[in-house]
Amino acid sequence: MSDVVVIAGGIDGLVAAHLLAAKGRRVTIVQEEALAERTVGWVPPPVARALGLDPVIKYPDPWLRAGPLELWQDMQRSVESIRRFSPRDAGKWPEFSERMARLGKLLARIYVKPPPSLVDMSFALRVRRLGRRGMEDLMRTLPMPVAELLDDWFEADVLKGALGALAVADLQQGVRSAGTAFRLLHFHAGSPAGVFRPASSNIGALLRGRSVVSGKVARIAVRAGRVSGVVLESGEEVAGSTVVSDVSPQRTLLDLVEPGWLDPDLARAVGHIRSRGVAARVRLDLERAPDWQTLTLAPSLDYVERAYDDVKYRRASTQPVIDAVADGAAVDVSVQYVPDGGSPSLALLAPHLPAIKAQRMVHGQPHQAELALDQALWMRPLPELAGYRTPIGGLWLCGQAMHPGAGVVGASGYNCARAILRA
C-alpha cells in the first residue's frame, strides 16, 4: 500500500508526486496522459530547485508580431517598432513595462505560496513593500478591464489590440470585462519587463518516464469519509491513504467520487465552476517553417470585443482573434472566440502560412477552470477548495484549476505537496 496515490493528468501531479517522494512518502503515480515535451508557462525557480531540475526556458523573439508591429525581449527594439505607429506610445512603453513588472514580481512571489487570504498579514506586508504608489497601482489594476488599462497608456490600436488579446486568451470575457487587466499581469509574472507572453520549457520532457502505473481512473475509493485509493477502468485497485488529483475538480469530486460523500451545496458550487471552452486549438503541420515565430491577429480592442460578442450568443466569430506560435514547420494556433463544438475559421491566417500538410483540432478549456479574477487567488476555484484540501479525508487537488492556475508551471503541485506535508 502506498502512502500517496497521485492521479497525474499533467505536470502538477508529477511535481507533487516527486516532492512528496523526496520527503519519504511512498508514492504511486497513475499517469493518465502522456506529457508533452514542450510546456508553456513560467517555471518558478523554487519549483525547479525542489525537483533538482534545470529546465531550458525559452521566449520567442520577437515575442509578439502583429502585422508590422514587433515586440522584443530587448526593450529598445520594441520601442523602435512601436515608434512607427506612435512616438508617444514608444516613449511610454518602458515606463509601462517597468510598472507592470513590479506588480508581476509581487504575483510571482504569491504564486509559490498557498493562496493568500484576506486576513493574511504576510500578504499585506508584501503588498505594502510596493510603496504607496505601487499599492495604488495594484489595487486599481487588478479589477480593471484591460481595455481601460491600455487606453490609459497608449493610443495605437495595433498595440492595444494585441496586448488585449493576450489578456483574454481562453477566457469567455471581452477586453471591456472587469478584471481582465489581472490576466495581463498574471501572464507577466516571472517574465522579463516588457514581455507579456509565457515562456516555454522542456520540463515535461525532464519529468517523463517516472510514472509507475498507466491507466484511466474509474473512481476514487472512499470508506467512512476517507479515501482508501483509486480503482482503474481495468479493475485494478491502487491502495493509498492519500489521493492527490491533478484532474479537474469537477471530474474529481463529481465523477470519480461516489455521490453522497460531498455536501450538496459544495457539489452544486463545484458544478458551477466556470470552465467554458471559448477557443479552438489547431495544430498545423506545414511544408516549411513560416517566416515568423509568433503571429497575433487582433488589430484593435474594438475588434477583440466584437469577436467576443459572437461567442456570447454561441456563434463562432467570423473575424476571430488568432494567436499562433511556430516551432519550425509545426504551428500551434489558438482561434478565439469559438464556442465548444464550433468550427473555427482560419481564413484570416491563410495568407501568412506556407502550404498546410495536416491539421488537428482540439476544443475546450485547457486550464480546467477559467482564470478570471473571481476564480483567482483565495477564490480559486472556490473559497472552500482554495487550500488544495477537499472535505473528503485524504483527498487533495493539485491541477491547473487550483491556485495559481495556468501559466505557472508546477506551482499548483508544489503548493499542494507542501500543504500535505504540513497537514
Name each model-derived stretch.
Residues M1-V4, A22-G24, A376-W378, P383, ...:
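Extreme N-terminal leader/targeting segments of oxidoreductases
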Residues S2-V112:
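N-terminal glycine-rich phosphate/pyrophosphate-binding loop and immediately adjacent elements
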Residues A101-S214, P366-A369, L373-A376:
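Active-site/ligand-binding neighborhood in enzyme catalytic cores
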Residues A193-R197, K216-G328:
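Mid-domain catalytic core of redox enzymes
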